[in-house]
Amino acid sequence: MEEIRRYLQLERSQQHDFLYPLIFQEYIYAFAHDRGFSRSILLENENPGYDNKSSLLVMKRLITRMYQQNHFLISPNDFNQKNPFFAHNKNLYSQIIAEGFAFIVEIPFSLRLISEGKKKKIVKSQNLRSIHSIFPFLEDNFSYLNFVLDILIPHPVHVEILVQTLRYWVKDASSLHLLRFFLNKYWNSLITPKKASSSFSTRNQRLFVFLYNSHVSEYESSFVFLRNQSSHLGSTPFGVLLERIYFYGKIERLVNVFVKVKDFRANLWLVKEPCIHYIRYQRKFILASKGTSLFMNKWKCYLITFWQWHFSLWFYPRRIYINQLSNHSFAFLGYLSSLRMNPSVVRSQSLENAFLINNAIKKVDTLVPIIPMIASLAKAKFCNVFGHPISKPVRADLSDSNIIDRFGCICRNFSHYYSGSSKKKSLYRIKYILRLSCARTLARKHKSTVRTFLKKLGSELLEEFLLSEEDVLFLTFPKASPSLQGVYRSRIWYLDIISINDLVDHKSKF
């Protein structure tokens, strides 16, 4: 972001938060295109012609056309009508503008993160290294809890709600009108992943997540404030982590002593409420507690009433269930988490007698949801619905090394993201599907069988490339420091949480 700030020269325009002039700058689209390509999880470009056709010359021609009079006048009321600006090369120009504008709108959020980081004096490397620390938190705390309540937050009823959220940071009316145009045009595909076919919805989900996350953070800040005003519980300070696309707040247990004077006698009242753990990722949040089922039911009614009356978001109470952690698993961040009883037997012997003591230790299992993963791989044509690997159709001009590179990158991304799973059997099955699909794809290209092709190429080379645990620069961060290696030695969590939306949402498009 510092490099982008240097190129954008925001010192003059930042006083008024004018972002619209940046649409006419060439380097904006260069930054947006490079980031979109390097951030691609599976390097599977949905429109290969876009990357081939996009160049600096095309961007200059696009900016020239935008400067022409009456060619770039867009109204939110006529977004479905034909615009003379998009009459020529509609798909290419709309994709470039969508990426560039999504990059521009993120600037106020990024500047806000930088300023907050400087105020709190947060070290950047440590701030990024704890991206996946939510799972060690689950392992340390959820094993002592009893009930879990997972709720799916509804989408805003109208696109204007998200636009109003951005008005706190952007006072530029032209930028807000352009944002309103894009959101109105692609609103259905943004809130419904199955309909995501447009360039703005598939390549710029990051912008929608930023807007939605800032919108939900207003609910959460109000909720924490009201909770503190009406309860004896205290809450730890929290920050809205817009860049990491998840919010974490924890209300800690507190014991207050009240003195009631009656007949000159002091009675001590101890008020002790169970601890509440609150985690949210995008639209889904989880509320867990050590209290009783009645206590969780009160929280459920309180949350539903709070969201409906203060923010006009309608929940379906019958679809919200309170489950016991001992016999229920919940899906979060692409994992399937549950509590498992780990039995252990301790033999105690005295002078004459010996005793066997059975202890059951609760342990959090984080598993790879293999059924949704196979469904996603089948949708991407890596295997069939039964999990049998198949050859993936590729372009004839791709070289063997390029095909292996793509499959290897996909395999390493899965390996890095699910490196902390407690059972690796499902992960090994996914690797096997990708490895054999790569071999069948190469054999299909050379019009040969898999066995013949592997004998010719050498299976060691393919295994070494696909199963290597190299760090992917655009996905992972440096591993834990030597002082932390002894804490979580069995499981390693490291990845850029911005880059794993496709892995978290198994129904997304590979």
Curated annotation (Swiss-Prot):
Gene Ontology terms, MF aspect: RNA binding
One annotated Gene Ontology cellular component of this protein: chloroplast
HAMAP family listed in its UniProt record: MatK
Lineage: Eukaryota, Viridiplantae, Streptophyta, Embryophyta, Tracheophyta
Localization annotation: Plastid
Entries under InterPro entries matching the protein: Domain_X (IPR024937), Maturase_MatK (IPR002866), Maturase_MatK_N (IPR024942)
Name this protein carries in UniProt: Maturase K
A single BP term in Gene Ontology: mRNA processing
Chain's role: Usually encoded in the trnK tRNA gene intron. Probably assists in splicing its own and other chloroplast group II introns.
Gene behind the chain: matK
Keyword Cell cycle among UniProt keywords: no
Protein family membership: Belongs to the intron maturase 2 family. MatK subfamily.
